Amino acid sequence: GGHCVARLDDDPAGRVVFVRHALPGEVVRAVLTEKSAKIWRADAVEVLSASPDRVRSVWREAGPGGVGGGELGHVALSAQRTWKRWVLADCLRRIGGEEVAAAVAALPEAAGTGAVPVEAMPSEAAAEAGDDPRARRLAGTGTRTRIALTITDDGLAGMHGFRSGTVLPVTSLPLAVST
């Protein structure tokens, strides 16, 4: 999740590249992070034409070249829900077939749209309504109950880089539940 599909402008083969930290419709400058015979991956490092759904990432350490786990941190909450709804519906259709997709579309919550219902968490709803200043700051964060930390060579708390065995130090984890 959290990748956009791009095509290289100057590639006669029309090669497909999966780009993290981009949004549908954006034009970005990206750095290739992985090349194989079947798939290329990249990180968007500069946004040349931004989506209206782009926001400042809630977790800079999960940005380009950083740790994994924050691939939608730069996406507005309402757009995250739309994205997740589409991914879930697509998976149900591909794996479960059209019969499952039709059953989901018939759910009262889908309201005839065929979309899978994805609702805001209470903190998100309060933030969107402007009811709670703290929730506004924390909306979309503080929900992850499990994290996998490791130790860097310097003895600092860290996490693995995206698709990497390299341990990167982390000083914040805004997605984690605070106690």
Predicted regions, residues:
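Accessory RNA-recognition modules of RNA-modification enzymes
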Residues: 1-179
